């Protein structure tokens, strides 16, 4: 199928619900008009004062939410990092609010500037009045204060500090608006096709959206491009001005093999999480959007990762069995001998890519 035809097919599928909505809407609008005319004749409906009520009635009748709806279903994906194979997905391409998962991209660009020599871990990041005024979660920095780049990294990874995220944006691009445009450009360059960033923190903005699949792409890019900085994502606590801040990612402490990466929450998004876990030489990346609570989100993440680790182990054992030579006799172990539980896995270090590479799943 030609590329243009594929695009048309995808657009038709995406817009089909809206066409049916419009058909239902035509009938509903006719009945609403009739009803409002009758109410006005009875003196119940007054166009000037009842406009808001009328709009709410219309939206309910058309099946539209009066306010941005909270995610009612999980959007999740699990991939095997080494192969890029999608092992599990559910609503992985649905647009969702990323919340503080946004800060993963903020950190990606900070690491990019440090690696390029435009900053160092000791560089000071000034705090503006706008940055200091950001709503929690925050470090409650004051205008005129500054924080080192390394302290800023810890603050985003653990406390998920919105004031620090805005300060980073202003340091790197002059304004947060310019930084958000840079974030979106980088997202497209990495292969995050449906992601748009509007700020550096993930604070509510109706135009700031992403998908579970896109966030998996970002997690892969972060580990691939900045392995030297990835250790920060396993930080479980951070001390600032005599106070200790714990990492919101509880999987670091309670789920074996977890070494990253970031949580996120706003009311409209539910509880989100990107996690990377390595066991027996196999690394999986999981993304979950839309948990009702942080605990239910964590349980869901652990469940889908458990299932896929079992699946990968089964496939690996099956492949190993098929690859075993069948012409040579294999003696059974002597009584009392024990076979090793696992064999050592050699790991090769790869140099980070000079330019961003697109990742597709």
Describe the function of each predicted region:
Residues 21-22, 37, 50, 54, ...:
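Alpha-helical protein-protein interaction elements
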Residues 1-75, 79-82, 87, 118-120, ...:
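N-terminal secretory targeting signals
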């Amino acid at each position: 199928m030609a590329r243009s035809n594929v695009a048309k097919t995808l657009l038709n599928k995406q817009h089909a619900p809206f066409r049916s909505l419009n058909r239902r809407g035509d009938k509903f609008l006719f009945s609403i008009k009739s009803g409002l005319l009758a109410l006005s004749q009875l003196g119940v409906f007054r166009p000037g004062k009842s406009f808001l009520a009328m709009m709410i009635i219309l939206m309910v009748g058309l099946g539209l939410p009066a306010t941005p709806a909270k995610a009612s279903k999980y959007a999740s994906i699990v991939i095997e990092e080494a192969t890029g194979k999608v092992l599990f997905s559910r609503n992985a391409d649905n647009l969702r609010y990323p919340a503080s998962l946004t800060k993963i991209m903020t950190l990606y660009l900070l690491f990019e500037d440090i690696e390029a020599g435009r900053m160092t871990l000791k560089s000071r990041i000034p705090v503006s009045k706008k940055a200091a005024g950001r709503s929690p979660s925050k470090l409650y920095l004051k205008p005129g204060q500054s924080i080192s780049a390394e302290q800023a990294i810890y603050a985003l990874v653990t406390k998920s500090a919105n004031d620090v995220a805005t300060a980073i944006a202003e340091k790197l691009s002059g304004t947060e608006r310019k930084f958000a445009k840079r974030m979106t450009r980088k997202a497209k360059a990495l292969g995050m096709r449906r992601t748009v960033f509007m700020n550096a923190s993930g604070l509510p903005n109706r135009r700031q959206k992403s998908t579970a699949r896109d966030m998996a792409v970002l997690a892969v890019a972060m580990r691939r491009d900045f392995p030297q900085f990835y250790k920060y994502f396993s930080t479980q606590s951070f001390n600032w001005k005599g106070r200790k801040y714990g990492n919101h990612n509880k999987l670091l402490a309670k789920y074996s093999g977890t070494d990253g990466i970031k949580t996120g929450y706003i009311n409209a998004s539910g509880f989100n999480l990107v996690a990377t876990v390595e066991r027996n030489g196999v690394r999986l990346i999981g993304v979950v959007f839309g948990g009702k609570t942080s605990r239910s989100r964590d349980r869901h993440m652990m469940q889908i990762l458990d299932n896929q680790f079992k699946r990968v182990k089964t496939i690996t054992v099956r492949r190993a069995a098929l690859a075993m030579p069948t012409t040579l006799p294999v003696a059974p172990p002597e009584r009392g001998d024990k076979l090793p539980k696992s064999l050592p896995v050699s790991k090769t270090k790869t140099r980070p890519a000079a330019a961003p590479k697109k990742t597709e799943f």
